[in-house]
Amino acid sequence: MATSTPSRAREHASAAQSPGSPTRISRMQEKEDLRHLNDRLAAYIERVRSLEADKSLLKIQLEEREEVSSREVTNLRQLYETELADARKLLDQTANERARLQVELGKVREEYRQLQARNSKKENDLSLAQNQLRDLESKLNTKEAELATALSGKRGLEEQLQEQRAQIAGLESSLRDTTKQLHDEMLWRVDLENKMQTIREQLDFQKNIHTQEVKEIKKRHDTRIVEIDSGRRVEFESKLAEALQELRRDHEQQILEYKEHLEKNFSAKLENAQLAAAKNSDYASATREEIMATKLRVDTLSSQLNHYQKQNSALEAKVRDLQDMLDRAHDMHRRQMTEKDREVTEIRQTLQGQLEEYEQLLDVKLALDMEINAYRKMLEGEEQRLKLSPSPSQRSTVSRASTSQTSRLLRGKKRKLDETGRSVTKRSYKVVQQASSTGPVSVEDIDPEGNYVRLLNNTEEDFSLHGWVVKRMHMSLPEIAFKLPCRFILKSSQRVTIWAAGAGAVHSPPTDLVWKSQKTWGTGDNIKITLLDSTGEECAERTLYRVIGEEGETDEDFVEEEELERQFRSQSHQSVDPSCSIM
């Protein structure tokens, strides 16, 4: 490929002679680069040939497809024109149906105002009944407290009565023992008196015996004296008189000692008996006085007990009367609540029926708008490809672009000219949210841009959301779930906003939480947010729908629809149970 001069040949020879010279190395490098470039050129040529073959094949297929599409377009154009005429007829029918529904909505609104007035009257009656019930309950609690106090006093008096009865029984037992002891002492005294009388009789008897003995001795002595000598009679008589005198003195001394001893014993025993009798008499007197005092106290306690029993009976009768009044009030309240629930159920059914009709109308309208837009785009594409002039009705068609605003109702009717000079109108759509809840916390709002989801505590108490989960579901998006932090407490009537990471919000608990692992909550139609408690049971949900407006609507129409929707929401919020609000 390259020619070399004689000098270069010499250089080659010298390079061959010196294998490690720089010239030889550069030549070898150039040779290698040239070989690589040749390989790349061959591959490129092969690739170009392959692409040219594919191009010729694709040209053949394109020609065949153009022939087929031209035939199909001719058939489809006729079919689309027929279906478009049918769609226009259906749109006219839908407009007529909408006018009829607006008239019915006015009637329903009037009926709702009447039901609301009647409901407010029932609520006032219910509040009055509840106030009366609270007053009766407070009076009942007061009477129950007084009854409990009286019963406690009665129990105390009964305990005191039992104690007094026990004391009376003890005193009566002591009195019986004392009486028995006094009786025994009296018997002992009588026995001692009998013994003393017996001793006295024995003493008299011995005196008589002694006197008789003395007389007999004297008689015998006199007899002996007669026999004795008269000379010694005087001496003997004197000695006998002395002996008798001494014997009499000894006998009298013995009698006196025995009498003194007997009197001392009797006096001591009698004194002991008298002391015991006096002591027993004092004890019996004290016992009698104590028994009298106890009887008096028992009578007093019995009278107090009868008085408290009468008061207790009166209070029980009063409690029964209050209980009857309370039962009647409860029955009346139950009947009023049943009537109110029935009316609320009827109102809710009426509103639910109207809402379902409205949703069906919106679904039909949305389907028609989507189908008309699809037909219009296909016809415009075919007209541009076939270079056909658009019809006058097609010049005035509108294409409404869906844009999201925070007002949930988007509208735009400013006309502008596109590049072809045709009049174009931005299409607006409404964002409708439907919610329900069965627990204390509800899903208050869903951002159409997917930036946040807001929860609301509907109660007057703090509520713990430990273990609760907020889940998003969509037909074309994967299911995602956000678990609320541990020990998270939502204050009464407070809101918490859960921001996506892409919204750029600041994490500020407990009012603002940031989901750092999720860029957005998602956008589109039919986005559903559900709130699950710690057991996995669904407590609240909210669904976001996008409803496209009609072509002929003006700003005033959208304003009127927005006003009707706001009134409908406020009326639904007032009439429906707070646990199941419909928006």
Curated annotation (Swiss-Prot):
Phosphoserine, modified sites = 21, 391
Polar residues bias: start-end ranges = 15-26, 390-408
Name the segments for region: Tail.
385-580
Spell out the subcellular localization from the entry.
Nucleus lamina; Nucleus envelope; Nucleus, Nucleoplasm; Nucleus matrix
Q: Where is the IF rod domain?
A: 30-386
Q: Region (Linker 1): which ranges?
A: 68-79
Q: Name one GO biological process term.
A: heterochromatin formation
- Source organism superkingdom: Eukaryota
Q: Which GO terms describe its cellular component?
A: intermediate filament; nuclear envelope; nuclear lamina; nuclear matrix; nucleoplasm
Disulfide linkages recorded for this protein, renumbered to the chain, are none
The post-translation modification note in this UniProt entry reads: Phosphorylation plays a key role in lamin organization, subcellular localization and nuclear envelope disintegration. Phosphorylation by CDK1 at Ser-21 at the onset of mitosis drives lamin disassembly and nuclear envelope breakdown.
**Region span, Linker 2:** 216-242
* PROSITE patterns associated with the record: IF_ROD_1, IF_ROD_2, LTD
Family named by the database record: Belongs to the intermediate filament family.
Name the UniProt record assigns to this protein: Lamin-B3
Question: Species name for this entry?
Answer: Xenopus laevis (African clawed frog)
